[in-house]
Amino acid sequence: MKPKTPRLLVQGSTFARAWQINRFIKAKICRSEGMKLVTLLAGLTFFCGVAFGDEKNVIQQAPKELPGQAPWWSIDLNSDYTLGSKIIKSGNFGSQAVYHYEIEALRNFHLFDKYYLQCGIDSERFDFSRSNSLYPSSISSMAAEVSFSYWTGEDFYPVLKLEPGFYYTGDHITPNSFDVPIRAVAGYQIWDKVHLVLGVDADPFEQEPVIPICGVNWKINDQYNLRAVFPQPRFSYTPNKTLEFFIAADLIGGGYRNGPTNDHRTNNALLDYSEYRAASGVNYNPQKGVSFEMTVGWSIARRFDYFRAGPDDAAKSAPYFKLDISIDL
């Protein structure tokens, strides 16, 4: 006969089992709560990693400017002052000085290979210290600029440039002062480091509506370069990457529509103003995309030519000073 188990022992065993089951359930619950906490912490860690890690990746993986990559913007500001000199045919008029500035801002759009479309504005002004019905107080232009240009890795060379805008004297902006000067230039390699440069400069407002551009560009070596191209020849010496010394010639001016005057010869007439200069100077490049060019030279001749109506006067030569600032962004 099987011996009976005492009732108290059975109840104690039952309580023990219940206690074990309760402990097991609590352990499960704690383990579940712990898993939830771990999951929450892992989620927060992942979120923070995404938030801050991606920002770091964005900063680290931002596209860097490649060597030779063209800038988005090209800005150029030049200003010069020509000391006073007398106009030869108007000795009683007195000595006339000239202050000149030009600002150009262009946005560069890549087309293909090394060719770019440049679009922007060009504003230029000449202010004269003396004026009358023959010689205006100022000559100005406000024009848009559209260029198809070649990027060498350091500079843009316009192949085709159009500058539609208003070319006027004083403050007389009128519909008949609208003009579209056009410049087309191409280079052809004829020998190693020697290029033939040919082109035309067309402007209906000038006495010669089409002016040829011709010459050669010879990169003698890494330090010397000869750009024998009319009308802006230049010989330069570059001892290092930050400095360039040069001698050069420059032709500035253009065709403009004169405003109303009391002289029938100049009243609303076309004026071809030109100034040919020779100079030497230095170009300083403290960093890529920034340059300062300082020039001291001689204004050989300044000319006021109302080629359709009569007066054609020139001023005597005089010294001038120029500062040119170029910034690429």
Model-derived features with residue positions:
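Cleavable N-terminal export/targeting peptides
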Residues: 1-72, 329
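Transmembrane beta-barrel domains of bacterial outer-membrane proteins
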Residues: 54-175, 179, 269-277, 310
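Transmembrane beta-strands of outer-membrane beta-barrel pores
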Residues: 79-87, 121-127, 164-170, 200-206, ...
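Membrane-embedded beta-strands of outer-membrane beta-barrel proteins
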Residues: 101-105, 144-146, 182-184, 214, ...
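Residue-level signature of outer-membrane beta-barrel architecture
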Residues: 107-109, 148-150, 188, 202, ...
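Repeated loop/turn-to-beta-strand initiation elements of outer-membrane beta-barrel proteins
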Residues: 111-117, 154-158, 193-198, 223-226, ...
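Outer-membrane beta-barrel translocator/channel fold
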Residues: 126-132, 231-314
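Outer-membrane beta-barrel "beta-signal"
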Residues: 213-218, 223, 280-285, 315-329
